[in-house]
Amino acid sequence: MAFLWIHVPISRIWYSNLRKCYIKMLYISYKFTIMKEVLIIMWIADGWKEYEVIDTSKGEKLERWGDYLLVRPDPQVIWDTPRKNRGWKHMNGHYHRSSRGGGEWEFFDLPHQWELHYKDLTFNLKPFSFKHTGLFPEQAANWDWFGDKIRNAGRPVKVLNLFAYTGGATLAAARAGASVTHADASKGMVGWAKENAASS
């Protein structure tokens, strides 16, 4: 029976200073008679200076996005630990999930839009529906990985980025030297990606 290889990018929420975290798990075969070890490699998005998960509790996470603190729901936060970090009381934005689905933002001295930097890339952030800000910071682990692959390819590289959202991967691939085609079904997201490209 073959081993399972899973590549999972995650943020520093669980592991603060690790580059790779190896987790061994037991894999039970379809006959439930043979147990095998499965190796999961998690790459940590540890290159951020302007983003961090500060704390998690009661189904929510407290994050720093540049100079601003946001509280957003996270279904993976299943523990009920005390909220001792003062950021919980000094947040700039809080996304409240509705029991009917969706939710809405509540703002406290938060600009309509601001910039966030990752290495030499610049992103324009603005909170919008479904708790989003226009960026998935944990994906920086992938940006670094394929950026290295592109730079070391020794040949011209073309990248087709589908469902490209606001262009984080597009900008990272282009910065590494690739020729990138950015595609997304949402005209608004494509426009936002163009703003990010202009800022970078």
Annotate each predicted stretch with a short phrase.
Residues 48-64, 70-137, 144:
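Non-catalytic substrate-recognition/targeting regions of SAM-dependent transferases
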Residues 147-200:
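Conserved SAM/SAH cofactor-binding pocket of Class I
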